[in-house]
């Protein structure tokens, strides 16, 4: 009698765990869910047309980049938000993302990068 009830308890506990069974695995496995939790960084700059790329960096396609200026002050709020954020579409440089035409930014700063220039991309084809 103890054997079947023990087996039922173990099966019940197994069903309640957060294991990734074949039928309910997310695409890319269990750890792929962590990548989906990235939100867009806070808007910043004139008219909120830019996005934060670091604690003192605000960039936008129409604006260019503001580094350490009043336009980038709002970006300091990102330090107090619990979830990670990501700005820019295309990865570039060392852990950076394209911030504006020809500019690649990471949380530490920005630099010119031809990979972020849409006109250069089309002219190379």
Swiss-Prot record:
Keywords assigned by UniProt, alphabetized: Amidation, Cleavage on pair of basic residues, Disulfide bond, Hormone, Signal
GO biological process, one term: response to external biotic stimulus
Gene3D superfamilies, alphabetized: Neurohypophysial hormone domain
Glycine amide, modified sites: 28
Cited SUPFAM superfamilies: Neurophysin II
Keyword Metal-binding part of the UniProt annotation: no
A GO term for molecular function: neurohypophyseal hormone activity
Source species, domain of life: Eukaryota
Signal peptide interval: 1-19
Transmembrane segments: none
Cystines in this chain: 20-25, 41-85, 44-58, 52-75, 59-65, 92-104, 98-116, 105-110
Gene Ontology cellular-component terms listed: extracellular space; secretory granule
Assigned protein family: Belongs to the vasopressin/oxytocin family.
Subunit structure: Interacts with oxytocin receptor (Ki=1.5 nM). Interacts with vasopressin V1aR/AVPR1A (Ki=37 nM), V1bR/AVPR1B (Ki=222 nM), and V2R/AVPR2 receptors (Ki=823 nM).
Matches recorded under PANTHER family: NEUROPHYSIN, OXYTOCIN-NEUROPHYSIN 1
Role noted for this protein: Neurophysin 1 specifically binds oxytocin.
The protein, known as: Oxytocin-neurophysin 1
Species: Sus scrofa (Pig)
Gene name of the record: OXT
